[in-house]
UniProtKB/Swiss-Prot annotation:
Protein's UniProt name: Alginate lyase
Gene expressing this chain: algL
Function recorded in the entry: Catalyzes the depolymerization of alginate by cleaving the beta-1,4 glycosidic bond between two adjacent sugar residues via a beta-elimination mechanism. May serve to degrade mislocalized alginate that is trapped in the periplasmic space.
Coiled-coil portions: none
The species this protein was found in: Pseudomonas syringae pv. syringae (strain B728a)
Region of interest (Disordered), residue spans: 359-378
Chief localisation class: periplasm
Cellular compartments annotated: Periplasm
Catalysed conversion reaction: Eliminative cleavage of alginate to give oligosaccharides with 4-deoxy-alpha-L-erythro-hex-4-enuronosyl groups at their non-reducing ends and beta-D-mannuronate at their reducing end
Length: 378
């Protein structure tokens, strides 16, 4: 049957409008959640005690490190003190850089001193120019360090790139060098963590996806954004109907800790996706909410996890407030209950270098408490 002539222009118009809308959507620049546009708090010009610490030596060697769980069985739940010390020693320069960038960016966003901006950018450009962390020789612990470092730096850098104070306006050459380096590292992280069998996909993959999401926005790369979203969906579909992650339940006495550790990258990815018009909350029937609720219930009553895997839970890590930094993006995605909000406010501010610094300043600035908090995150 022929389409009536009167309808043809309408269909054509719809097609044109549809293609225009698609083109507009495809070209829209990626952005972080709203709080990342915050200006410098108060520009200070008087005497100060700030001094830029020595930049750690760029790590250009192969990324092969001992695991802190060396000698443990498949559960990877028993720490080896000797190998942990060796790991900390071998990766010291990397973690010093991560912590340093995060700390100095926070200081700059508070005080606005040019010396602070110089310090943060010099740390990153020094490592970028040395092609640090790019080695193709790595083991599992090594590729883990690469994605952690990338996530730490790129998420701190977002505070500079998107601030309405425009601190990078006159530092475009530095920005170009840093973003090109982040981009290369992200490509390698994608390669490192792609196509793993489902039984090998756990919190490490989620943290890799977070580092790629932060870099996607820092470098405006849609392909990286799409990969992070894809990995999030894999993670969400690992959450069972009761809110447990089977691969993290294998961690025996540390199962609850690792469920909690899985939440920061997933909540951040969902928050960043939402800022760019992608709502990941419905994935696998609200998997992120289910996981968050299960962890919060487990923290109140660890026997929930003990009954599920037969192991009394080690609560050591869960006594550290920064371990709950995921509550900031989580409570921006969902309406948290009054008791959860009360707990969140008691623990604030949440400063964790692996998520780029002070998340309370980004997500809940009215509850910021100045210098409280230690920027934990390991």
């Amino acid at each position: 049957m022929q389409t009536p002539k009167l309808i043809r222009p309408t269909l054509l118009s719809m097609a044109i409008l549809s293609s225009m809308a698609w083109a507009t959507g495809a070209s829209a620049a990626l952005v972080p959640p709203k709080g990342y546009d915050a200006p410098i708090e108060k520009i200070k010009t008087g005497d100060h005690s700030f001094s830029c610490e020595a930049i750690p030596k760029p790590y250009t060697d192969k990324l092969v490190f001992r695991s802190k769980y060396e000698g443990s069985d498949k559960a990877r739940a028993t720490l080896n003190a000797v190998s942990e010390e060796a790991f900390r020693d071998a990766t010291k320069d990397i973690t010093t850089l991560e912590r340093g960038v995060s700390k100095v960016v926070m200081q700059y966003m508070r005080d606005g001193r040019p010396e602070q901006l110089d310090c943060a950018l010099n740390m990153m450009t020094t490592w970028a120019k040395a092609d640090a962390l790019e080695s193709r020789e790595f083991n599992h612990t090594g590729k883990s360090m690469r994605k952690w470092a990338l996530g730490s730096m790129s998420s701190a850098y977002l505070r500079l790139k998107f601030s309405e104070s425009h601190p990078l306006a006159n530092r475009q050459q530095d920005a170009k060098i840093i973003e090109a380096w982040f981009s290369k590292l992200a490509d390698q992280v994608v390669s490192d963590w792609s196509n793993l069998p489902l039984d090998k996909i756990n919190n490490h993959s989620y943290w890799a996806a977070w580092s790629v999401m932060a870099t996607a926005v820092a470098t405006n790369r849609q392909d990286l954004f799409d990969w992070a979203v894809k990995e999030y969906k894999v993670a969400a579909n690992q959450v069972d109907k009761d809110g447990f992650l089977p691969n993290e339940m294998k961690r025996r006495q540390r199962a609850l800790s690792y469920h909690n550790y899985a939440l920061p990258p997933l909540a951040m990815i969902a928050s960043f996706a939402q800022a760019n018009g992608v709502d990941l909350r419905p994935e696998n029937n609200g998997a992120l909410k289910r996981l968050g609720d299960r962890v919060l219930a487990g923290v109140k009553d660890p026997s929930i996890f003990a009954e599920h895997n037969g192991e009394k839970q080690d609560m050591t890590d869960l006594k550290k407030d920064p371990k709950f930094a995921w509550l900031e993006p989580y409570c921006s995605l969902y309406t948290c209950s009054p008791d959860v909000l009360e707990e969140k406010h008691e623990k604030q501010p949440f400063k964790t270098f692996r998520l780029g610094g002070d998340l309370t300043k980004v997500y809940d600035p009215s509850h910021e408490k100045g210098d409280k908090g230690d920027n934990d995150g390991s």
